[in-house]
Amino acid sequence: MEGEGRREDGDCSYLCIPFNSIRDIFQSFFTRFRGLTPDNSPVTISQEVEEETEVVNIPRSVVSGNVAARKGKQQTSSGKGGGTN
């Protein structure tokens, strides 16, 4: 009976993962669970910077006007390849 992970021709069929990938995976888990940044310094509330985003409401008439202008500029295809559609 042959060992697990071996083929009949003698070659191993084990999965090979580079060490750097394993190290990066473990580092991301440790930093997430311990509340540390990737450079291993603790995160405090005073150091966190909130990014502000501005929400702008655009009237529907402005949006539909732009779509109508684009539809008028479309060219019909001649049916030949390589042309402008």
Swiss-Prot record:
Matching InterPro entries: PEP
Keywords: Plant defense
Biological process annotations from GO: innate immune response
Pfam family, one: Pep1_7
Propeptide residue span(s): 1-62
Required for ligand-receptor interaction, annotated site positions: G79
Top-level taxon in the UniProt lineage: Eukaryota
Region: Disordered, residue numbers: 66-85
Record-stated family: Belongs to the brassicaceae elicitor peptide family.
Biological role stated in the UniProt entry: Elicitor of plant defense.
UniProt protein name: Elicitor peptide 7
